[in-house]
Each structure stands twice: as structure tokens, then as C-alpha cells.
Amino acid sequence: FWGSGAQQAQLMKDAEVDMSTGWNGRFDNAKKDGAKVGYTFNQALLDYDCFAMPKGAPNKEVAMRFLAEVSKPQYQANLPFYITYGPTNRKAYEMTKAPKELIESLPSHPKNVPLMLPVSLDWYAKHKNEALELYMELMSE
């Protein structure tokens, strides 16, 4: 197991492991650095990040405007030029100028999403104790 995002790709670059879980962006950077690494989205876990604001936040309106702005497809269409995690606004795929090969390699590309298993936070909320017990058992082996 790895302890940080940087470590997952470094383990592959140094040939310390033959297989690993990890974030596609880290593996893409390792590949750019010359590592012999590849991955597939087949049966991968599709996970999302999010923004949150505390209840009663004093600048809620500004935060909401920020979220509306960064969600616009014209901004997200440029995201693949900087990082390979892919846009979350599907309309960005219709307007991006990124090369087809790059676009089709993104996890959020419409051809890749059906291959993956979405992470269910609802499931983890309902099965927290069971999941923790199984994880601890796995880690102690």
C-alpha cells in the first residue's frame, strides 16, 4: 500500500511493485517521466471530489458564484491541458480543443465511465463498521 499520491507512482517508477492502485493523473505523470506504467478503467473505482461550505458561512454568495463559474464548460474544456483527471461538466467534452487521444484517456470521458464502479458514500455510511472491520483485517495480514 502507498501512503501518498506521490508514492503510488514512485513505487511503479522504481519497479518496487508490479501492480498498484492509484490515481490516473499520478500514473500519467510517471509515464511522462519515462516510467513503464499503464492502467485501465475496466472495473476501476469512479470517485468524485467536492467543495463544501460550512453552514452559516459569512461569504456563501461569493462561494456559490465561484462554484457556478468553475463549473462552466468553457473553463473545464481547458482542464485536460493541465491535469488528466477530466472535466465534470460533460459539455466541456463538446468544446475542448485537446487532442482526441488525450480526451478519450480521461476517466470522466463518456466511453470510460460505464466501465467503472461508482464509489457509493451512501453504502459506506450504512456499512461503516463492517467496512472498517474488513479493512483492518486486510491491513493486518
Label every PLM stretch briefly.
Residues 1-4, 45, 54-59, 123, ...:
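Extracytoplasmic/periplasmic, Sec-exported soluble proteins
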Residues 48-50:
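Short, solvent-exposed beta-strand edge segments and adjacent coil->beta transition regions
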Residues 45, 54-115:
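Mature extracytoplasmic/periplasmic domains
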Residues 7, 11, 16, 52, ...:
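Extracytoplasmic/secreted proteins, especially bacterial periplasmic and envelope-associated proteins
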Residues 10, 111-141:
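Conserved C-terminal helix/tail region of periplasmic/extracytoplasmic solute-binding proteins
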